[in-house]
Amino acid sequence: EIGSGLVGSEMCIRDSFTTFEKILWIGSIVLITGSAVMFGKDGILSVIASLIGATSLLLNAKGNPIGQALGVIFSILYAIISFSFAYYGEMITYLGLTGPMALAAFISWIRNPFAKGKAEVKVNHIHRGEVLFMFILAAVVTVVFYFVLDFFNTANLIPSTVSVTTSFLAVYLTFRRNRFFAVAYAANDIVLIILWSLAALTDISYISVVVCFVIFFVNDIYGFVSWSAMRKRQAAEIQP
């Protein structure tokens, strides 16, 4: 069943993008590559991670499970970049939380297609009780990670801790196939733009990472718009 979902995803990737989405992807690639060329150190690794990340976000915006698979790869590369600047919070978050949850989301999305053989996940709605549970769990994770990050003398502790909170909310909602995952990721992008801007004050090469998350922010906003439209369309198609 998972194999057939993958085949469907691969077959539909090329033909499913709108003109706007193609422009968005090409624009993201050009800006990411340009910023990496302009700024030296870690440029190659940053650009590879960013290109994978941008492609992942566009596929996620389409509800395509392949986007989550690319998200696992991005998590590993981003953790390496974070380690280079002693952002242990980011490293631990992406290796211990975002990466594994992206893998879990990949499996969840593959197992819950909107229609058999289609490379589009079924949009899910979560109720108030689960929303409350999610925020309580996020609070617990935040407190635990604060002390862990403090123990490792993490650079810029407060924004690093806030990033853990937004990352957790994002990966939880992604796993649950809820459209607000894109809003949580957009919030996380803002935190990371601030975080890496602080890093860029010390090492200008990290400007390429800042550019990466500005682009991610734009893609995540589009992801929410896309999922909102997808939710309405799926609801209309289900109606008898």
Model-found features: residue ranges?
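Single conserved hydrophobic/aromatic residue that forms the stacking wall/gate
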Residues: 1-8, 12-13
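C-terminal transmembrane-bundle signature of multipass membrane proteins
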Residues: 173-240
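Membrane-helix interface "capping/anchor" motifs
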Residues: 58-70, 172-184
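Short, hydrophobic transmembrane alpha-helix segments
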Residues: 33-44, 61-63, 84
